[in-house]
UniProtKB/Swiss-Prot annotation:
Gene name in the database record: nodA
One Pfam family named in its UniProt record: NodA
Disulfide feature: none
Keywords, in A-Z order: Acyltransferase, Cytoplasm, Nodulation, Transferase
The protein, known as: Nodulation protein A
GO molecular function, one term: acyltransferase activity
EC number(s) per entry: 2.3.1.-
Highest taxon, organism lineage: Bacteria
Cellular compartments annotated: Cytoplasm
Length: 197
């Protein structure tokens, strides 16, 4: 049975403290099973991990936050080409709803991407999530690119780490919005020029 989820589209400035606290708890519970540090970054009411989203789609059911997807418009560099994208990140589905088809409802974001007029949306995920994100590709909304490295800055300054990191083991998800996929630049390195969303 598909859960009854109501979707809320909100700009970051519209969120109030109770919203951040509820989202922080949601992210801790959603991300902790993938590693203790992954959940720890959401302590203290923090509802973002790296870059802060400008727009969020939040799904609610009778138990609270059921799903979330964040969006941030930014310029990235693909190979030698600067490219405006809407980065998608902070994706999560409450663990008790995994496998119930709620991920398909995240397509609520697609009309928003069209309204924003960006040429592409992009995000990166661990290879373990290939089957999960491939659901978006079945409808023809997205493409998965492998063999692409993504360079990002750390969200904070760490004295024992360089200021940037390169993820060699990620899948890049690209959604053609205002352009066709054939117009996505060739390149094996994407430079975020900032922290991951």
């Amino acid at each position: 049975m598909r859960p009854d989820v109501q979707w809320r589209l909100c700009w970051e400035n519209e969120l109030q403290l109770p919203d951040h606290l509820e989202l922080s708890e949601f992210f801790r519970k959603t991300y902790e099973p993938t590693g203790a540090f992954n959940g720890k970054q959401f302590e203290g009411g923090r509802s973002w991990a790296g870059a802060r989203p400008e727009l969020r789609v939040i799904g609610y059911d009778v138990h609270g936050v059921a799903a979330h997807l964040g969006l941030l418009r930014r310029y990235i560099k693909v190979g030698d080409v600067d490219l405006l994208v809407a980065e998608l990140g902070l994706y999560g589905v409450r663990p008790d709803l995994e496998g119930l088809g709620i991920a398909h409802s995240i397509s609520v974001m697609y009309p928003v991407l069209q309204q924003l007029g960006v040429p592409f949306a992009f995000g990166s995920v661990r290879p373990a999530l290939r089957n999960h994100v491939s659901r978006f590709c079945r409808k023809g909304l997205a493409n998965i690119l492998s063999g692409v490295r993504v360079r990002s800055t750390h969200p904070d300054v760490y004295l024992d780490l360089p200021p940037t990191r390169v993820d060699d083991n990620v899948l890049v998800l690209v959604l053609p919005i205002g352009r066709s996929m054939s117009e996505w630049p060739a390149g094996t390195l994407i430079d975020r020029n900032g922290p991951e969303l």
